Structure formats: structure tokens, C-alpha cells
């Protein structure tokens, strides 16, 4: 057994427990029972003093160790093929070393820690049993894929995780042939896996398809749509429900309390994967499709009997969807996982199988086990103490400012309510929840439901604020159109993480919200240029009660402008922008926080004898027509600047200018938008350079359009 080269304080260290013996094919059934044990037995950590330090415990001197742990077995594993001859005992050692490696790497890069630690044994078992990449393994969301990446040829690049030109934080098809499906958003893998399974069948292939889903993803309707279709199509595939108590149907509430019973549950699950019982059910299943009458009823009873024998939980939900259910299974028991996966792989059967694995988020790292929410996504941290190294700032995040503004509105108006889709921390609404517990609604990862739920609240005279990340708003677009905008219901959309988002990359980039929201006929579309403006736009949205509205704001902190007194914003005049700096020849019309880059660009240009006009549009819809006319008629060049895709704010300005005849004369218009491609993950600074949205890029555009190419080159190189 390998030991993690990390140490933890005595008050949270694990008790030493004997390691289970290797799986013996000849062992009796009764020998597999551990009466009274918990399904999630404590990790088998113990003090082991060796020459290079103390591992997995507090040292005698009270010192902690945070250097890279020794991983002699993992060092020999570059790809899954290298695991095939390992014994179960060695697989356990590999799991321990893999967990240590994940902790060490994430401590240096930041990233998703808890989810990855929770699937270490499952990852090892999957790659041991199945033959990837021929067999397909899909990781839903993908933030638990770090152990998978380490075992599939990318260990030497883990130090680049989520960094510019480094490994992605999720699975990515272009990164490795072992990443058969790209992820980042939740609840997609059963659908994609089913498509792969049906495609395999149509092509006459024999490979396996495994979809791993959980960690909140089972709260989304798509997962159930896919399971329903999988049961109907009856193609062979394996669905692994990674139940870490953050799914819609956790073990404790699936059909009432179902307490895990440790090795007893493991033994029952091993029995449940017994081939004769499975094949008995398949016979009955086939018969019921071909005959009727009394014989049909008999066959149905055989199927019911087999299913009852097999389903240890007593739940028929998954079976009613047409899935063959096995579980619950201890997701940290290599013996059981390997045995069950091999049985399922080798059994001649037809149709989808669901294996219900019970796992612990943050497994093997006490700090993450005790505070799963705080160690889901982490900054760089000290492995020995769990302390995260978060940057200091004199300002708060836009997310926090939004939450404070909404609390202020709710204090003044009892009809203000808040909705989020399993992102209470990410959207800041946990702050709202603490103040107004009966007026805040977490609907799970169910953005479609969140939007229509908000529409229903609006129908009853409430003032719903639906806080959803910009990229996740994409998942509820039909609801935004059909259930909200078409009916002119006053739902307020607070779209966080607008624009580039850094390490989370293109899956979470909020590039498209202005484009897809501003084309809706009844929608008011706004964006604040700073945190004070955000307070005013929250107040504006609260005051708009005859139609829907939305506002976007970025990841990151405010710029330090004075805030409204008492955190209470003042409603803005709808469709009115403002001029911040009066200049000549060239006007920069910024939208959202891009206004700050416009101001910085104006400062770069001024030493060259050119004073620019800088305006803050505030609204994309309705546009400030008077402001645009003024800027177009009094300047040679109008440049619109936004941190969004083609078809957004600039396109709406161009549409108006063209129809108003403002482009028929000498006035030139130039748009600066995100390029028509996905911006890869990296540091925010690198992403802005890649996108061409830095102040020097804006300044260079000014000089180029004026024909001053030398100045343009100079401003880009200084």
C-alpha cells in the first residue's frame, strides 16, 4: 500500500483500520460480510515513518510535509495498458498513489479537487477492466477527470492544468484520444453515450460504452430524457451513477432512508451482478416482447422476481425507465468495483445497465471531506494545512456586489425573490438565502425549470431574479423565449461570468448572451461598466415590471469606485447611455466592463495628441439612439467595444446606424468583439491578448482606422 506524502492534524486524522485482503475467487459468500460496517469505510491511512519523511500523518516533531509524494507504482503507469497485469492489491496501492498525485498537482495549479478525489478507485477500476480508448468512458461535467488524465498519458503535463497552453480542466476531445467526449456542462454523458452505443451497433462494432454521471448532474432533466430513451432503444451501455450525496436521488432519500450497510451491501451487490440471475431476467425480457396472454403474465412475473432479487435498494425508478439496476456499490472498494464491472462487461445481455456507486467527495483528504463545498474548486493551497492561497484585493467580486444589491432591493420590497440552479455560492445567492431563507430557491442543475419557475412566480406578482451563469443560460433559451419574453413576464436575469472566464475556458465563457438575449423583442438588455453601475442595474431591473430584463457582469473583482449609499441603487432611465470623456475625431462606445478598457485606451492615445470621446452605452436594448447619432455625427470614427460575440451590441448599433443613414456619409464604424472562435483556457490576461481586447489593441485600432500605422505599431509594442 502506498502512502500519501501529506500530513494532517491529529484531530482529523483517520483511525487505523486493517486493509481488506485481496479478492479471492474461491472465498465463500459469507466471508464477504462485514457486519455493522459502514459502506464508506474509513481510508486505511496509518503512520509509516520512512527515511524521506512521515506520510499521511502528523510527524513526531509536529511538522507537515508538502513536497511531491513518492509514487513508485504510479511511476510505471503511463497508459491504461500498463495496468492490465496488476493484482487487486497493487490496484489499491495505485489508487493511494494516484490520490496523492492529484492532491499534489491541484495544490500547485488550483482546480476541481473534491470531485476528482471521490472517483479515484472508480477511475482505476474502469481503466483496469475496460480497454480504452476502444471502449468509451465519458465523464459527465468532466471536473472529476483529473485521475483519468493522469492514467492516460498526461501525468507529465498536470502541472499545466487550466493554464495557458496547458491541459484543460475538463475532458476535451482534441487533447487526447482517451477523452471521447468533451464536457464542462452537466448531464450530457448519458445522451452522448447512448449515441455512441447506437452508432457502434449500426457500425457492427463490439466496444463498450460507459457513462459516468453524478455530482449534481442527476438534477437535470436531460439525464432522465436520456435514460428514458436508453431504456427504449435497449442498446448495451453502462451508466455509473456516482452518488456522492450531490445528486438528485442520493442514497438517503431515493425511496426513503436506505442506510449503507458496508460489506453487506457490497456482498449483496456482488450477488446482484450474478450472471444466472441477469440472464434469467433477459430470458423473461425477451419472452415478454414476443408472447401474450397467461404466458406473458408468467414471464412478467419471472422478470419481476429476477429484478426484485437484483435490486438491493428496493427502488424501481431506474428499472421503470428500462435500465438494469445494480447497487448500491461501495465506490471506494476496488475489489467490488472490479468484480462487478467485469461481470457486467462479460455478461451476454441486451440493454443499458446502471451501477449505483456510493462515493465520498474529497475522499482521502480530510480537509476536503470535512468541507466538500470549500474544496470542490480550489485555488492553489498548502496540502499539509489545506490553506488556500487566494489573492488579496481591495474590492469584492462582481458576484458579491450583485448579491448585496439584491439583498438591498429585497429589504425594500418583499416581492423580490431569487432563483439559482445549484449555484448558490457561485452566484452569491447564499448571501441572499441567509437573509431571506423563504425567498431563495435552489432548483438544482435545472436551468430550464429555473426560468419557467421564475415565469410562474412573475405571474403571481412576485419579482423573480434568476441568477444564472451566462454560459448556463444557453441551456434555458427556449424557456427564455417561449415562457418569458413572448408573454412579457417580468423575469429578471442576472447573468454572471459574462465574457472571458480564464481557467474554466470555452465551456464556461460567457460570449453569447448579448447576442441571444438582445434579439428577443421584449427584453431589456443592460451591462454595467463598474460595480456601482451594477447596483443601479439591479435596482433598474427591480423597477421594470412590464417586461423581462437582463444584465450581465463578469467574473472578477470591481475596480474600486464608490458604491451607492446603503448598497441601494437608483433605477436608470431605460435606454439611456452616458458620455464619460469628451474628445474629438474618434469616439469609443463601450458596452459593459469593456468601457474600462476604452478609458485605458484613451489614456494610451492621448500622449500622441489625440483625445478620444469615451461613452458608456449601458443598454444594448433599447439602444440610446440620440447618443449614437451624436457620436456618429460629431466624430470621424465610431468604434464599438464589447466582450461578446459577433451579433451582439456592435451589430445592433450598426443595424440602427444603417437604417438611420448614419453610414451613408463619411463616418466610419468599426466593431471590436470577441473573435469568431472559441478562446482556450488560460489566464485572463492571456485571454484578452488572444482576443484582441486589451487597451493597446483598442488604441491600435484607433490609429489604424485613422491611417496612422506607425503609431498603431508603437502602441502595441510598448
Curated annotation (Swiss-Prot):
GO CC term (a single one): chloroplast
Tissue expression as described in the entry: Expressed in trichomes, leaves, flowers, roots and stems.
Main localization (coarse): plastid
GO MF terms held by the record: 1-deoxy-D-xylulose-5-phosphate synthase activity; metal ion binding
Enzymatic reactions: D-glyceraldehyde 3-phosphate + pyruvate + H(+) = 1-deoxy-D-xylulose 5-phosphate + CO2
CDD domains xref list: TPP_DXS, TPP_PYR_DXS_TK_like
Pfam (any one): Transketolase_C
Residue span of the annotated presequence: 1-55
Keywords: Chloroplast, Isoprene biosynthesis, Magnesium, Metal-binding, Plastid, Thiamine biosynthesis, Thiamine pyrophosphate, Transferase, Transit peptide
Superkingdom assignment: Eukaryota
Cofactor: Mg(2+); thiamine diphosphate
EC number: 2.2.1.7
Gene3D superfamilies: 3.40.50.920, 3.40.50.970
PANTHER family: 1-D-DEOXYXYLULOSE 5-PHOSPHATE SYNTHASE-RELATED, 1-DEOXY-D-XYLULOSE-5-PHOSPHATE SYNTHASE, CHLOROPLASTIC
Functional description taken from the UniProt entry: Catalyzes the acyloin condensation reaction between C atoms 2 and 3 of pyruvate and glyceraldehyde 3-phosphate to yield 1-deoxy-D-xylulose-5-phosphate (DXP).
Family that this chain belongs to: Belongs to the transketolase family. DXPS subfamily.
Complex formation: Homodimer.
Alphabetical list of NCBIfam families matching this protein: dxs (TIGR00204), PRK05444.2-2 (NF003933)
Protein name: 1-deoxy-D-xylulose-5-phosphate synthase 1, chloroplastic
Organism from which the protein derives: Cannabis sativa (Hemp)
